[in-house]
Each structure stands twice: as C-alpha cells, then as structure tokens.
Amino acid sequence: MPHFILLTKLTSDGVKTIKNNPDRIAEVNREMEQIGLKVHHQWATLGQYDFISVVEADDAETMAKASVELGSRGTTVNETLNAIPSDDFAGSL
C-alpha cells in the first residue's frame, strides 16, 4: 500500500483545541484510521509544520478523501506528499 507524508499546520482554532484537549491528537489518529489511513509515525515539530505524519492508504483517492476531511474541520492546513521507497525509486530509473 502507498505511503504518504502528511505535513500539518495548526490553525488558531487547532492550537486552542490541542491546548484544551491534548488527547485530541490520538482521537484524530483514530478518526483517520476509520477513513482508511494507517498512521505509522507521527511527530510534533517546531518550525514550518506543527506535525509530520507518515501514513499508509489504499490509494491516492483514499488519501485525498482524508485530506479533504481533515482540512474541512478548520483546525489544520495540510500538505500531502506521495512517499516512494528509495529502492523502488532507484529501480524505476
């Protein structure tokens, strides 16, 4: 199954939500799994993005659906990258 890198910035509403309910991070991960994603790794980061997640989805359409769902909530702005294993990439050259 394809892997994706999900780069997340919290909006001001998102910051308030996390501050008032830190468990919301785990809740969102469970919700992403219900949409069809599997969260493999997730880091809170300092800098341009607030969270970086490595997720797996059945296909790009499932990832797109999840991205729209997450973005529609108004608490995050997301950027999604398709992650190709380096061995697969090298083999395709």
Which role fits each region the language model picked out?
Residues 68-93:
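Glycine-rich beta-strand-turn "strand-cap" elements at beta-sheet edges
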Residues 5-9, 43-66:
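Short, well-ordered beta-strand segments in beta-rich or mixed alpha/beta enzyme
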Residues 34, 59-61, 81, 91:
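Short alpha-helix boundary/capping motifs
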Residues 41-43, 80-81:
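Short beta-strand segments at enzyme active-site cores
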Residues 37-39, 75-76:
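A short, amphipathic edge element
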Residues 15, 53, 79:
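Short, flexible active-site loop motifs that bind/organize anionic cofactors or intermediates
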Residues 1-33, 38, 45-49, 86-93:
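Short S/T/G/P-rich N-terminal loop/turn motif that feeds into the first structured element of a domain
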